[in-house]
């Protein structure tokens, strides 16, 4: 029988400090214990391990009334789920747009931004904003987390609040760097070349009643990848296109909530494994 046990030992959230009224920073520390018996989930053996560490430090600087800079660095150790170490989580310029027609509000993020198109993508690396140490792998697959979490490019977000409805519209276009562990997730351990994400194009819409007891959403993703083999490689040059549709829903009660995301994904690949390989 496969057993997987996760124990969260504690969470420390550091208070916000401000040396000036236009600058603030804070951080968090999370440490857990895990044990996997008869499986390779998180760990590769049956031992109890502390390979569930998350440390983050973020800051915010107000440049002007409607322009600011926000950034976060974090250290992650998730066992065998993803590459251990420090990474730049996000660093972007936030421009709050002037009042728009119809009482809409808007903002633009330029730089490395967080993915706003799925329920838990924005706060994926903030332990106290989610309810489990390991998110559902059908949507938030850990092996590809760094590329799915955010992108380098531009993102727009528009919101509208009325007496009966709350609307949110998001659009983004950019790309992410693909490290070796993510390359191995896509092409296997025998791949020795380099893989590049040409672009990732995303859009989403969310609706809530004014009571905020429900949240319904839909999102779309389209992305291209190219692989360049090394001189001594078991893979060949090729490319892949991924298109994903997600429908989501949440219900919020006073002391509990229910979340669901339904995903449909299409992949079109050419080359990669051998010259005539093609799949749709």
Q: What residues fall within each predicted segment?
A:
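Outer-membrane beta-barrel biogenesis signature
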Residues: 5-12, 16-46, 115, 119
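Detector for outer-membrane/organellar transmembrane beta-barrel domains
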Residues: 20-24, 32, 206-280
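Outer membrane beta-barrel
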Residues: 22-25, 46-176, 206-210
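Sequence/structural signature of outer-membrane beta-barrel proteins
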Residues: 32-41, 74-80, 100, 115-117, ...
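Conserved positions at the start
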Residues: 153, 202, 244-246
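Internal alpha/beta core interface subdomains
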Residues: 170-172, 179-206
């Amino acid at each position: 029988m496969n057993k997987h046990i996760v124990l969260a030992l504690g969470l420390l959230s550091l208070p916000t400090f401000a040396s000036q009224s236009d600058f603030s920073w804070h951080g968090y520390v999370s440490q857990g214990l895990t044990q996997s018996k008869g499986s390779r989930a998180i760990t590769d053996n049956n031992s109890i391990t502390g390979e569930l560490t998350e440390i983050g430090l973020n800051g915010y600087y107000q440049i002007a009334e409607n322009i600011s800079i926000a950034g976060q660095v974090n250290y992650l150790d998730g066992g065998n789920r993803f590459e251990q170490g420090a990474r730049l989580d996000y660093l972007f310029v936030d421009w709050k747009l002037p009042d728009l027609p119809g009482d809409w509000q808007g903002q633009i993020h330029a730089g490395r931004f967080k993915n706003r198109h799925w329920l838990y993508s924005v706060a994926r690396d903030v332990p106290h904003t989610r309810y489990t140490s390991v998110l559902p792998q059908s949507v938030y697959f850990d092996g590809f987390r760094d590329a799915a979490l955010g992108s380098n490019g531009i993102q727009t977000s528009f919101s509208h609040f009325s007496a009966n409805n709350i609307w949110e519209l998001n659009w983004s276009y950019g790309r992410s760097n693909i490290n070796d562990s993510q390359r191995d997730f896509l092409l296997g351990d025998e791949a020795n070349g380099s893989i590049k994400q040409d672009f990732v194009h995303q859009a989403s819409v969310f609706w809530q009643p004014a009571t905020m007891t429900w949240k319904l959403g839909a999102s779309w993703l389209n992305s291209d990848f190219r692989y360049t083999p090394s001189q001594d490689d078991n893979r060949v040059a090729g490319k892949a296109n991924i298109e994903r549709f997600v429908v989501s829903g949440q219900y919020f009660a006073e002391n509990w909530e229910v979340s669901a995301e339904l995903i449909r994904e299409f992949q079109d690949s050419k080359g990669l494994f051998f010259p005539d390989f093609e799949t749709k």
